[in-house]
Amino acid sequence: MTPMSDGGTSESIFDLDYTSWKIRSTLAVAGFVFYLGVFVVCHQLSSSLNATYRSLVAREKVFWNLAATRAVFGVQSTAAGLWALLVDPVLHADKARGQQNWCWFHIATATGFFFFENVAVHLSNVLFRTFDLFLAIHHLFAFLGFLGSVVNLGAGHYLAMSTLLLEASTPFTCISWMLLKAGWSESLFWKLNQWLMIHMFHCRMVLTYHMWWVCFWHWDGLVSSLYLPHLALFLVGLGLLTLVINPYWTHKKTQQLLNPVDWNFAQPAPRSSRPAGANGQVPQKKGQ
C-alpha cells in the first residue's frame, strides 16, 4: 500500500516521500543521533547543575541519563500514540493496513531510538557486568518490530502507533527514580507521581488487551500485510508483554510505593543495619 498523506499542509517533514528507503533509513539514523544527543546533554546538564547526580556511582549515572532519554521519547510516543488511538480517521478505517505519512516519521525515528536503547543497555551490561532479562527482551522485540515496519512498505501503522503509546509510562518512571535518588520518597509529590505511574502501567495492560482485540478482528489484513516472521515476532512480543512483563513491572512499581526502595540498585548483601538513606538504597536482606 502506498503511504497516504495528511494533506492540506505545507511542505514539512511529514510530506517526504516515505516510499524511499533512503528517507526512511535517514530518519532512523536521525532518531538514533537525536536520542544519543539527549543522553549526552542530560549528562552535561546534570553534572553541572545537580548535586544528587554528582553523588551517584557511574552505573547509576548511566541509568539516570537513560531514564531521562526514555522520558523524552515517551513524550513523543504518547502524543503520536494518542492521536492514532483517538483521532486519526485513516488508521481507524483500516487498523490492519491503514498508513499515514506522519506515522512513517514516528516509526522511523522510533527505530533509531530503540537501536540506541539496545546499544546503551548492552554496553552498560558489559561495562558494569549486569543483566536485566526483561529489559533486554523488551528492547530487542521493540527494535526488531519497528525495524520490520520500516522495511515493509505494506505494514499498517495503527498497531505500531499503539505500541508507541506503551511508552507513556516512561516520564513518570523517570521522575520517580530521580526523586527517589534525591531522597524525596516521603514527599507528597513523589507519592502522587508513583500513583500516576502505577495507573499508567495498568493502562499499558488495558492497551495490550485492545491490541489483541485488533489482531483478532483484523487477522486477515495483518496476515496479508505483514511478513510472517514480523507477525510472529509481534505476537510473541505482545504475549510476553501481556502475560509477563507488564504484570511484573506493575507489581514492582506498586511494591515500590509501599516500600520506597531503589530495587534497580539494591545492595547485594547487607553492610549494616542502618535504614534507607537519601538515595533510597537499603541493604537487601537474605531471602527477599
Curated annotation (Swiss-Prot):
Residues annotated as transmembrane: 25-45, 71-91, 103-123, 131-151, 225-245
Protein origin, superkingdom: Eukaryota
Main location group: endoplasmic reticulum
Membrane topology: Multi-pass membrane protein
InterPro entries linked: TLC-dom, TLCD
Any one of the GO BP annotations: lipid homeostasis
Domain TLC, first and last residues per copy: 62-262
Record keywords, A-Z: Disease variant, Endoplasmic reticulum, Membrane, Neurodegeneration, Neuronal ceroid lipofuscinosis, Transmembrane, Transmembrane helix
A Pfam family assignment: TRAM_LAG1_CLN8
Keyword Lipoprotein: no
Compartments (UniProt record): Endoplasmic reticulum membrane; Endoplasmic reticulum-Golgi intermediate compartment membrane; Endoplasmic reticulum
Quaternary structure and interacting proteins, as annotated: Interacts with CLN5. Interacts with CLN3.
Job of this protein: Could play a role in cell proliferation during neuronal differentiation and in protection against cell death.
Protein name, as recorded: Protein CLN8
Gene behind the chain: CLN8
